């Protein structure tokens, strides 16, 4: 909500910007084109009127930052999530670069006090050729900062996250787990963006 995808006219609609791989996967998995779709979502929560009392304009200057689940300091500086967003200039360290961005750049702004105009949640329902139905939910409100996939089939189901994929068959109890942990940390969605 605070980074490069915060405004549709400067980037893309958020579903395209953040879920294009998910939609590609669904199209590949079904092998079908979408016949009909409906979509609901809005920018309901990350607005100034919903900011907690005491929230500052920037996370580093915020009196309630340590209790905020959306703290940019915690996300980027402490946990080191999404640090590929920061271009480290020659002669600077990653810590220096992150702190400077948190002090002056778009990534240090309070999520409630940004100039964002994209939805903070969206639900997409699609009917594919062959009467296959698909739903996709893009949520900002989750403790899990990764994709989850659950595919229900007539003979089994597939569920996974960005590290593992588990395939279970209803008859016979056959279950297989595929582990992708060794590539999950690679940049550009483990190289998928480059192909």
Q: Where do the PLM segments sit?
A:
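Generic signature of intrinsically disordered, low-complexity segments enriched in small/polar residues
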Residues: 8, 73, 79-80, 85, ...
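Residue-level detector of functional hotspots within protein domains
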Residues: 4, 9, 20-23, 107-112, ...
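Sequence-level detector for tyrosine residue identity
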Residues: 76-77, 107, 112, 141, ...
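Alpha/beta-hydrolase fold catalytic core
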Residues: 91-138
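Long, contiguous hydrophobic alpha-helical segments, chiefly transmembrane helices and signal peptides
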Residues: 14-18, 22-25, 34, 111-112, ...
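Predominantly a Rossmann-like dinucleotide-binding segment in NAD(P)-dependent oxidoreductases
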Residues: 1-107
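C-terminal helical cap and adjacent loop that interface with cofactors, partners, or active-site loops
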Residues: 118-195
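Active-site rim elements
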Residues: 10-16, 109-113, 183-190
